[in-house]
């Protein structure tokens, strides 16, 4: 747990949990069919036998397609484990992580701390696939104005990837979001 005073407060985390449980539009696909690079195409990126940690999995739509996937989320709408990434503890180390819109809220310090927690759950040789919202308030409901989006930019990915020993190998638009791939040998 972070002792950083700029880390996400319990009140903000509860607000986000309520928002994504009750106000966020959900479906069986969780919107994955709307995106190309960060949608169902990600299934093709996973090699046989690779293990995947899906951070902020929501309704866990990739679970039925990827055998070794463990989904965590602050909501209980479909995750394998209801926990925030900052509090996720595991002995297992994963080959791949998905952060498809989940590490996307709060200050830079919160993003850094959450990223560090995710990286700590990964093997040395690993990949991270990101879908980042560059602070577009396009959820289609009135409460979105109160969502504490982080304003993602390429520079943030380059800085954080370097900090944790990764290289940004892909960065491109995916509809109104960014698709980013980090790799570490």
Give each language-model segment a name.
Residues 98:
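A conserved beta-strand element that flanks and buttresses the S-adenosyl-L-methionine
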Residues 45, 120-121:
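Generic structural signal for beta-strand residues in well-ordered domains
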């Amino acid at each position: 747990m972070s002792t950083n005073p700029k880390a996400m407060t319990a009140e903000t985390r509860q607000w986000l949990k309520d928002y994504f449980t009750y106000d966020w539009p959900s479906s069986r696909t969780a919107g994955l069919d709307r995106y190309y690079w960060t949608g169902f195409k990600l299934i093709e990126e996973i090699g046989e036998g690779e293990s995947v940690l899906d951070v902020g999995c929501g309704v866990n739509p990739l679970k039925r397609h990827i055998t070794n996937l463990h989904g965590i989320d602050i909501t209980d709408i479909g995750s394998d484990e209801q926990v925030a990434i900052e509090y996720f503890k595991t002995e297992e180390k994963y080959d791949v992580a998905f952060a498809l819109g989940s590490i996307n809220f709060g200050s830079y310090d919160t993003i850094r701390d959450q990223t560090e927690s995710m990286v700590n759950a990964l093997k040395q040789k690993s990949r991270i696939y990101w879908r980042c919202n560059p602070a577009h308030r396009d959820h289609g409901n009135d409460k979105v104005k109160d969502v504490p989006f982080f304003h993602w930019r390429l520079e943030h990915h380059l800085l954080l990837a370097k900090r944790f020993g990764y290289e940004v190998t892909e960065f491109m638009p995916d509809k109104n979001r960014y698709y980013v791939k980090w790799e570490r040998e």
